[in-house]
Amino acid sequence: AKEYHIDGFRFDLMGIHDIETMNRIREELSKIDPTIFIYGEGWLAADSPLPPGKRAVRDHVGQMEGIAVFCDDFRDAVRGSTFDEHACGYASGNIGGHYEPVKFGIVGATQHPQVDYNGLLYSSVPYAAAPSQAVNFVASHDGYTVIDKLRLSVTGDRAEEELLPIDKLIHTVLLTAQGVPFIRAGEEMMQDKQGEPNSFRSPDAVNRIDWTLKAEHRGLFDYVRQLIALRKAHPAFRIPTAEGLRQ
């Protein structure tokens, strides 16, 4: 942060760290630059020797001011389950069971009277003390890209022509929700990974950004660009406090 002026840090499997350590990291980085962004995966890959109450997991992020976590409820509700490649999500017509998790992401994982927290996919509580503690996303380096996921889950005679409007709806929900929107590089132009969900083991031919897609899918690219401009222009999409959201 001092030598290279890095302005953000992401923690893989942040749940293996303890709350006290994460808060200390936040404290020390804030001395250098209080705008440095800290976020991570609010879960574990396996069991941990840490007592459950001390783990820096999603449901404890309210105890870690200035630290954010990925909102996986939002991801799987909007685009379909990560654990079932053929499952559709809210944007592709599978509204049942996904309505509340979508609303949960829209309010930035905060407490809101219009969200039924019993209807969430993975979380059970409104864990974010402020919307800035929830990172809403629909794709990351792990798992399928949006377009790969849609090609697996959207079927039927009109499947191919439905992909673009579904992709647009996914990004509309993402970029108009409260919280911090996270966009994997290339999603704005339908970048795929040739159907590979774990591309860490794949060559550059799979992981590289294919810039020819920007021209091929210029309509989606411009649409996402305009959504970003809309979000930046209107404070209503960036309400900083949970109380402000409830009002």
Q: Model regions: which residues?
A:
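Active-site rim elements
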Residues: 10-13, 124, 154-164, 210-218
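Carbohydrate-binding surface patches
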Residues: 247
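Active-site groove signature of glycoside hydrolases
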Residues: 1-17
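Alpha-helical packing segments of well-folded alpha/beta enzyme cores
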Residues: 1, 21, 166-173, 178, ...
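Acyl/amide activation-and-transfer machinery of modular secondary-metabolite enzymes
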Residues: 200-210
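Catalytic cores of secreted or luminal carbohydrate-active enzymes
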Residues: 212-241
